[in-house]
Amino acid sequence: MTELSPKYNPAEVEAGRYQKWLDADVFKPSGDQKAKPYSIVIPPPNVTGKLHLGHAWDTTLQDIIIRQKRMQGFDTLWLPGMDHAGIATQAKVEERLRGQGITRYDLGREKFLDKVWEWKDEYATTIKEQWGKMGLSVDYSRERFTLDEGLSKAVRKVFVDLYKKGWIYRGEFIINWDPAARTALSDIEVIHKDVEGAFYHMNYMLEDGSRALQVATTRPETMFGDVAVAVNPEDPRYKDLIGKHVILPIVNKLIPIVGDEHADPEFGTGVVKITPAHDPNDFEVGQRHNLPQVNVMNDDGTMNELAGDFAGMDRFEARQATVAKLEELGALVNIEKRVHSVGHSERSGAVVEPRLSTQWFVKMDELAKQAMDNQETDDRVDFYPPRFNDTFLQWMENVHDWVISRQLWWGHQIPAWYNAEGEIYVGEEAPEGDGWTQDEDVLDTWFSSALWPFSTMGWPDTDVEDFKRYFPTSTLVTGYDIIFFWVSRMIFQTLEFTGRQPFQNVLIHGLIRDEEGRKMSKSLGNGIDPMDVIEKYGADSLRWFLSNGSAPGQDVRFSYEKMDASWNFINKIWNISRYILMNNEGLTLEEAESNVAKVAASEAGNVTDQWILHNLNETIAKVTENFDKFEFGVAGHILYNFIWEEFANWYVELTKEVLYSDNEAEKVITRSVLLYTLDKILRLLHPIMPFVTEEIYAQYAQGSIVTAAYPTVTPAFENEAAHKGVESLKDLIRAVRNARAEVNVAPSKPITILVKTADSELEDFFTSNVNYIKRFTNPEKLEISSAIAAPELAMTSIITGAEIYLPLADLLNVEEELARLDKELAKWQKELDMVGKKLGNERFVANAKPEVVQKEKDKQADYQAKYDATQERIAEMQKLVK
């Protein structure tokens, strides 16, 4: 056994440890066919750059789960990997090239892709280094990438199979267009923001000049693509105009007036301009009336030749020029300033342009129905918290067909080929013969990511061992911000191609926010690099903060004050471990376990040993229960309270009564309980703080704590009598300490302590453990009896089953003591009100477990006894007031 260094230094503790784990292969599946499999696939981070604090949180939660399951004897697999992140990564590489004065078009597709692969290799290395610093127990031998050959094969098969079923199709429709990235976007890649804008009201004159029809638009630059105006066929103001024509201003061409229910008589003037190539609703109107589709913009957001004098202008520049021209012509009625919702690209931030474009789509109705129906079966995906199941179902009910083609070079090139005759060939391999050209577009990144849970396991080969053993996966951990982007798509794609759910559970977490509750972003400059935090505090401190502040579905606020508290907690663990190991006298863990069994059987040890083992048992049960519910924050609070309050502040201090004695037999038992409890604490903590627990564990045990058994409840440790007795002992000691502090009596000054109790068992317990009372209260005189008369001038403390009097006549101010007792009385009244309200709730009494209801009734009786005793003491003290 070696000795821990005097001071906890996370840099020293964590240095080299991760590589030792990798060298020992402790992160790989056990291969034990008798063990139940448990698998997680990591949500693949984008190879766009370094990981942020949100990634640290996400992966910490996964590591906690997989480490605990590994210790519980499951055959665990945590499969790592990364996402090619098409549009985001391509944008980063293009930005780097622009700094060198180069565009992707200068390089050409092949050489540009070489540059992107270089970027990928660079940042994949960085990401893996960060994973190592976080201590993530992933199996690198199974690492995947969304563009590796295995996943590419799966992507091609899925595309071809859906195409053959008629669920992938190619067509010309209005889509969301990103003019900055020059690519199509799906609906959920568009972020809507309220912006200051305007409605421009314009007059379109009838062909005969008899009157004008007023229309309004937020995008007057699109008027060059107007092919009609629409009125409601039931609107009496315009019914007689249907079939006639108006003159399109500036362009001076005739366009028809059509009758269509899209025109709302109650909105505006009831007349709308129809621009089928630039508005989804207008596109539908155009389809119904067989109207032409006139696209007036280039793919970069500039106006094309159909805009006449405005050709080549940026769309926003053209907007102002168009308005000025309309005003010059007398066709502009007015400009109405208004805040309205405008779509922006989730990736580039550019204002999205609705644009007519030929794209590939996934038909969603059947896929969505399958996913929703599956949630009614035993094979459903369970969301934590459950409210996100409703979020998932609502999105599925309202989902539109998914545009999956992207006008990029980085990604899975669409497996479709065209020839001069206009034929389309879709297949997993290129068609035979000459004259075929592959579609230049690539698939939406989320198309390949949607296959992640099963493609990483070897699919489409369903006979490989990983697929048979580890699919479906057990748990997915991810943020609520990508339920639509990713979780939903994994569910419907996995169901379609495997007939199974992709994962049994989905743990949804929130976002990391700053101390003020703001979302972390580059624009606010409030982002935190997790590697900087680790450098200062260590990975274990960061992991403890991230888990301890975690509740399913909720956001977390980062603060350095909380990081200080995390470090202090680990430092406390370090110090008590060092104390225990320094006093261990060569005791082995096996010997400690044998001696602890004697304590459990009441063959050795004392009541404090039995008390800590009982509380350890309760802690193990509660922590395990909350881990199973993914309530890591609750589990963390339970661990913190047990370790700091019960173990360090009480039990370790209580053991000094034995360790500083001459009774060698008792010392061995006490050392055994200390080492045994410390060992269980380290195992409970290991999934959360792996580095420091491994460092301490190595001082007294063989092998790695990574594969040590996770603690389980030991029925023999249950000892309610010991628990009740020591809790009363703690209450007594605490009451005396508090009373000393109230009147400024130093702990070193001996005082008289009178303990009155009518409970004979409690009297016997206090009497038999008087050595502990004396050690912690420093009495000049200590009397424990049922026959004690309350002194006139004494401080009074009421604990369960006893009254404690401290005769401090020369120090006590009666009026101040009465004020203190009044506060005590108010406290007990508040507790009585709360428990009374709960017990007065018929639904609670009817639905709660009987033992829970009884616990509340016991509390009520206890609070009532304390209230009555306090009231009685107040009455006695009031007699002393002259």
Curated annotation (Swiss-Prot):
One Gene Ontology biological process: valyl-tRNA aminoacylation
Free-text note on domains in this protein's UniProt record: ValRS has two distinct active sites: one for aminoacylation and one for editing. The misactivated threonine is translocated from the active site to the editing site.
The protein's role, per its UniProt record: Catalyzes the attachment of valine to tRNA(Val). As ValRS can inadvertently accommodate and process structurally similar amino acids such as threonine, to avoid such errors, it has a 'posttransfer' editing activity that hydrolyzes mischarged Thr-tRNA(Val) in a tRNA-dependent manner.
Residues binding ATP, per UniProt: K522
The enzyme's E.C. designation: 6.1.1.9
UniProt KW keywords: Aminoacyl-tRNA synthetase, ATP-binding, Coiled coil, Cytoplasm, Ligase, Nucleotide-binding, Protein biosynthesis
Coiled-coil ranges per UniProt: 808-882
Quaternary organization: Monomer.
Motif 'KMSKS' region: positions: 519-523
GO molecular function terms noted in the UniProt entry: aminoacyl-tRNA deacylase activity; ATP binding; valine-tRNA ligase activity
Catalytic activity field: tRNA(Val) + L-valine + ATP = L-valyl-tRNA(Val) + AMP + diphosphate
GO cellular component, one term: cytosol
NCBIfam families attached to this UniProt entry: PRK05729.1 (NF004349), valS (TIGR00422)
Subcellular location: Cytoplasm
Provenance organism: Streptococcus pyogenes serotype M3 (strain ATCC BAA-595 / MGAS315)
InterPro entries: aa-tRNA-synth_I_CS, aa-tRNA-synth_Ia, Anticodon_Ia_Val, M/V/L/I-tRNA-synth_anticd-bd, Rossmann-like_a/b/a_fold, tRNA-bd_arm, tRNAsynth_Ia_anticodon-bd, Val-tRNA_synth_C_sf
Family: Belongs to the class-I aminoacyl-tRNA synthetase family. ValS type 1 subfamily.
Name this protein carries in UniProt: Valine--tRNA ligase
Main location: cytoplasm
Motif 'HIGH' region positions after renumbering to this chain: 45-55
